[in-house]
C-alpha cells in the first residue's frame, strides 16, 4: 500500500475543518494530518494537536504561537507552531503536503489557498471567497501549476458529480443547458420582508438544516451565500451568470442539479452533512465511507421547489449583478458583505442594512479589471473603507 496522503487543514477549528478531521480519522491508512491552523481558537487548536499530532500548527501571531508552543511542549507534543500569513502559506505550499483543505472563512483564506494552488496541490476548496475575489487569477494559477481543484461546498460538489468529466471544454459542447443551484432559503424563507429589519443574530444563525459557523449562517439567511456560490460556480464550471439558476429547495436533500439539452436533469441527493462532499473530494475518483447515514427518501417524503424572492433577498440580486459586471466587483461585494455581517453580529446594524451597505459600496466604487493579486487586495481594502464610512455616517 502507498504511503498515507499528507493533509493540511486551513481553518481546522471551524465546522468544515472539524468535519474533515472526522472523515480523516476514519481512514488512518489513507491520510496523515500534516498541519492544522486555527487563528483565534487557541484552546480548540491545542486539543486538536493533542489528538491528531500534526507536524505543524499555525496561529495568528507570535504571542499566541509562544503560548501554544509552550503548552504543547508541556503536553509532550512535538508539533511546531508557526504564526501569521506566512505560516499559513508555508503549510499550504510545503513540499511534503499532498492535499490542502482550504476552509478559512472569508478573504483571510485567499493567500494561503492561492499558495496551495501555485504549489500544485490537490486543493479541496471550501473557501468560496478565494474564487469570488480573484477568479481569473485563481483559475490561471490552477492551469499554470497543474493543481487539482475539487469543490467542497455541497452545491458545487453536487454539480461536479453531475457534470461529464470533460465539462472544461465548455458547458455547451457537453450538452449542458443550465446549472440549477439549490438553496434552502434559510431561516427567513417564509418571513414577510417588512419583518426582516427586526431579526436578531441568534435568529439568523439558527439554520433549519445545516450546522455552520456564524458568518456563513448569516450569509445563508440573507442568501448572500448563494450569491457567492453563483459567482464561484461561474468560475469552477466556466459558466456565464445567466446559465446558473438559483432554486429554493427547503429540504436540502437535492444539493444541486444539471439540466441537459436533451431534457435530462441529473441531481445529487444526500443528507445535509458536509462529511459527504468532504469524503468525495478526499477520495476522488474513488469513494470512501464518510460516517453519514444513508438517505431515507420515504422519510423525506416530499421535495419542494420555489423561486427566490428578490425583495426578501436583495443580496442575491447584488451578487448576480457583481458576477455580470466582473473585474473587481465580486471582490468588493465580498469585502462589503464581510464588514456588514460583522457589524450585524455585533448588533451595530439591522439585518436589512447588510444589503444597504453592500449596495452603497458597489455604487461608490467602480469595478476595474484584475491584472494581478494586488488589484484584488486593493479593491478589497477600498470596499472595506467605504463600508466603514457607511457605518460612521450612520452612527454605527
From Swiss-Prot:
Pathway named in the protein's UniProt entry: Isoprenoid biosynthesis; isopentenyl diphosphate biosynthesis via DXP pathway; isopentenyl diphosphate from 1-deoxy-D-xylulose 5-phosphate: step 1/6
UniProt binding sites for Mn(2+): 153, 155, 229
Reactions performed catalytically: 2-C-methyl-D-erythritol 4-phosphate + NADP(+) = 1-deoxy-D-xylulose 5-phosphate + NADPH + H(+)
NCBIfam families assigned: Dxr, PRK05447.1-1, PRK12464.1
Protein name: 1-deoxy-D-xylulose 5-phosphate reductoisomerase
Organism: Stutzerimonas stutzeri (strain A1501)
Taxonomic lineage of the native organism: Bacteria, Pseudomonadati, Pseudomonadota, Gammaproteobacteria, Pseudomonadales
Alphabetical list of Pfam families matching this protein: DXP_redisom_C, DXP_reductoisom, DXPR_C
General function of this protein: Catalyzes the NADPH-dependent rearrangement and reduction of 1-deoxy-D-xylulose-5-phosphate (DXP) to 2-C-methyl-D-erythritol 4-phosphate (MEP).
GO process terms (BP): isopentenyl diphosphate biosynthetic process, methylerythritol 4-phosphate pathway involved in terpenoid biosynthetic process
